[in-house]
């Protein structure tokens, strides 16, 4: 396995020599390396690209997300960087044709190798990325002897992505719509608790079968129409309880949770969605617990339908916020 590496052109941007080190931007500190080299580097934040939309195609969605990882990195490159902590670009895992399961396995292997040395952010790609991300995290815990890890999965998404991936009634396969059901089955097999929250879910975009499955599995969810200033305090209290019940956090953001006006470049644009301003307090609360945040991913950016890079810039800003929190945690460990 040898991930495809991002070109030097990706990590280019503005340079202000008059500011010296204080003019530092992400492209100045981003370091493309092989995952096997991380053990010899100082701790940092690792970026892993997942060039795949085979799961979106299986889920009858609009393809194009496989082109997203490098474009998100390009949008990230010119943002300011305020930490002495490096960002490592571990390249992009590429899915060839319909070889989804193989690509997910390869991505999980890179994640497992990276986590002992860095916090990780995975850039998709369709939301089938979530199965790869969780598998990498789970393999890390199994390899390091962590027993019964209480992993809190927090998904900002218009969809539950709890679809059936095995059925005697219809020819179904794993897709971008199945990852959290796959994760539930894996946790069941391992004897692990399944802690799953879905924030921003749309009742118009999820069938009764999916709501019934979410209720049966004990999913905590907040519908898109329920986000308002009046409900903020109660929802943050619920989020706090969710975080308190978990030892580790996995944050996953499907960009179709945002309104189509903010995120036009997705497979399934949201007619309603939830604004970044409304979701910001929830992101902030999660990132406050950076000591628990092991890994995150950003899914479903589809550059084929983007307008003036609006969605790429949104994805890059979210990635930047997460990377900042992770860098603060790495720095606190290095210099307690």
UniProtKB/Swiss-Prot annotation:
This is Formimidoylglutamase. It catalyses: N-formimidoyl-L-glutamate + H2O = formamide + L-glutamate. PROSITE patterns: ARGINASE_1, ARGINASE_2. Catalyzes the conversion of N-formimidoyl-L-glutamate to L-glutamate and formamide. It is an enzyme of class 3 (hydrolase). InterPro entries: HutG, Ureohydrolase, Ureohydrolase_dom_sf, Ureohydrolase_Mn_BS. NCBIfam families: hutG.
């Amino acid at each position: 396995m040898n991930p495809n590496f991002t070109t030097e052109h990706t990590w280019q941007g503005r340079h202000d020599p008059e500011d010296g080190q204080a003019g530092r931007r992400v492209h100045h500190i981003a370091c493309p390396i092989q995952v096997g080299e991380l053990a010899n580097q100082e701790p940092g934040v690792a970026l892993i690209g997942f060039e795949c939309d085979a799961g979106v195609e299986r889920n009858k969605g609009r393809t194009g997300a496989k082109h997203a990882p490098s474009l998100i990195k390009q949008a990230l490159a010119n943002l300011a960087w305020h930490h002495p902590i490096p960002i490592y670009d571990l390249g992009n895992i590429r899915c060839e044709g319909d070889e989804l399961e193989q690509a997910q396995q390869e991505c999980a292997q890179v994640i497992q190798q990276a986590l002992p040395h860095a916090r990780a952010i995975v850039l998709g790609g369709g939301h089938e990325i979530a199965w790869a991300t969780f598998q990498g995290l789970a393999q890390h815990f199994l390899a390091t002897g962590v027993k019964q890890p209480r992993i809190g999965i927090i998904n900002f998404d218009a969809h539950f992505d709890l679809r059936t991936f095995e059925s005697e009634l219809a020819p179904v396969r794993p897709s971008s719509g199945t990852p959290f059901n796959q994760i539930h089955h894996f946790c069941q097999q391992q004897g692990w608790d399944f802690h799953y929250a879905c924030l921003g879910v749309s009742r118009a975009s999820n069938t009764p079968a999916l709501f019934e499955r979410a209720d049966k599995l004990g999913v905590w969810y907040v519908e898109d129409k329920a986000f308002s200033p009046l409900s903020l305090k109660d929802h943050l209290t619920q989020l706090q309880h969710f975080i308190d019940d978990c030892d580790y956090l996995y944050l996953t953001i499907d960009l179709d949770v945002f309104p189509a006006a903010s995120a036009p470049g997705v497979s399934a644009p949201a007619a309603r969605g939830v604004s970044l301003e409304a979701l910001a307090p929830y992101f902030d609360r999660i990132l406050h617990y950076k000591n628990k945040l092991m890994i995150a991913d950003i899914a479903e950016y589809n550059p084929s339908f983007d307008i003036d890079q609006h969605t790429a810039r949104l994805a890059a800003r979210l990635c930047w916020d997460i990377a900042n929190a992770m860098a603060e945690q790495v720095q606190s460990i290095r210099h307690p």
